[in-house]
Amino acid sequence: MKKWLICSFVLVLLVSFTACSPSAEHESIKIGIAESDGAIWNYIAQKAEEAGLDIQLIPFSDYAESDIALANKEIDANAFQTISYFQSFTEKYKLNLAPLGTTYITPMGIYSKRYERIRDISRGAVVSVPDKAFDFGRALTVLQEAGLLTLKNGFNGTGSVDMIKDNPRHLKLKAVRQQDAVSGADVFVMKPSEAKKAGLNPKKHTLKSGGLMSEEEMNLIVVRAEDQDREALQTILELYQADDTAAFIEKEYQGDLVPAFLPLKRLSDWKNEFEH
């Protein structure tokens, strides 16, 4: 009986030591995200827990703050920005950040309750576009793709109305918050998810869809350059770029987001081209 009690006590100590040892603890990773991506990252977080990682999701509404927080080591990674935005922002503010891998592309379309076709848009029509800098730039490109205006050479996906070279219909661009997009405008340039929130019917009110499906508009997971090879972050990237994650995105977002997993080699080639 005494031997049994001693063995039991030793076993309890071993179990307690194992449970409390650093090797058994989950590594904590803080990731800054856009609130609209919560469903995806909750899915990733569940998978990460099985891999021994504890993902803490930090929502940001100001995208610039997310990059600054990453540079200041307040978070370990962020996932919200396109390649073109990342290039422009990090170059402007000299941040030592690096892309880890790509996630998805968000289509952007042209919608209207007043017009049925692009060619029907009248001279002087008011066009609402997103007020966030990089979405504003995307909207300009969508309008150019539709033949409604021409942008200056050197346009890199971000910028202001100063980048417009020709506006033959004299469209009046109105930069607004998403919730105000359909107020006082004839035409709206926005993402499908925003169009639905604004009460638009994609089948009835879409004049042009699927704009900006290029590599430069893929969204990224971004980390500090020194952490690019960090094992935990590489694991998170693998979990994100898995087939089951792509299937989840397609089912959950119904075309509002399109999975786009760029191989790391191609991302490195792009990064080298950007740096040189």
Swiss-Prot record:
Lipid attachment in record (N-palmitoyl cysteine): C20
Keyword Zinc (UniProt): no
Lipidation (S-diacylglycerol cysteine): C20
Signal peptide feature range: 1-19
GO biological process terms held by the UniProt record: D-methionine transmembrane transport; methionine import across plasma membrane
PROSITE patterns associated with the record: PROKAR_LIPOPROTEIN (PS51257)
Keywords: Cell membrane, Lipoprotein, Membrane, Palmitate, Signal
Family, per entry: Belongs to the NlpA lipoprotein family.
Protein name per the record: Uncharacterized lipoprotein YhcJ
Organism: Bacillus subtilis (strain 168)
Gene: yhcJ
